[in-house]
């Protein structure tokens, strides 16, 4: 199984805005903290608005499988951004160049992104992961298991409000 891993190289004293309202982002945060600014539930958050789609699109980027090239056991790229899609598709191409893999994770524990909703109630990051999974499958072939490794808190769905208000937001994935 190939598991591209997101590490956040954010030093102490970074001065970057903290989505949760602190003075700045904490150093070396866990990838589950990646979210919108301000975070869901905070005043001014883009969560629940059309603007969240633009934020998710900017994070994911526009790289498509045709932008990644495998030749002579090397991988190159001709796209125009370095978003999340580029990283994952590049790793899929590396796996292809190495002869394939049995399984491939398109992400893990991105619990600050998966429950974000747009103005229609859709989950744009989950949709982006679904699209990415299809593109990775196109690169690696139908025999490769392509999946997302949810954080334990994502397994039971997203409780978005009142009692009994649970959305199983990862079901599409």
For the regions a language model picked out, list residue spans one by one.
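Substrate-binding cleft and catalytic face of glycoside hydrolase catalytic domains
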Residues: 1-121, 145, 152
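Extracellular glycoside hydrolase catalytic/binding regions
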Residues: 109-111, 115-173
